[in-house]
């Protein structure tokens, strides 16, 4: 997808799923990225049990219909959404 279309999609996701989902998504994605998408390491960074992280990740999978651990295209999509949210956060100091 072209960048402008992705930005429209990211904006729609952010607005339709609300702050609670977005905050949880950012927290999980930050930990997964820091842990190179290793669930054990990410769960330690989040100070939660691995099964709790899996449960939260399943909620993201169901909501966005993506599998960032099993599909590289989906991983790129969620990484893009994460960068979109972080960039917006920096611009608006939200």
Kindly label every feature range from the protein language model:
Residues 1-94:
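Cytosolic nucleotide-utilizing catalytic cores of signal-transduction proteins
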């Amino acid at each position: 997808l072209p960048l402008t279309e992705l930005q429209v999609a990211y904006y729609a996701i952010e607005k339709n799923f609300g702050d609670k989902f977005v905050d949880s998504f950012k927290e999980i994605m930050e930990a997964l990225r820091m842990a190179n998408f290793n669930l054990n390491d990410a769960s330690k960074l989040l100070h939660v049990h691995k099964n709790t992280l899996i449960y939260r990740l399943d909620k993201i999978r169901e909501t966005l219909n993506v599998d960032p651990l099993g599909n590289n295209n989906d991983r790129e999509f969620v990484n893009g959404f994460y960068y979109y949210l972080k960039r917006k956060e920096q611009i608006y100091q939200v």
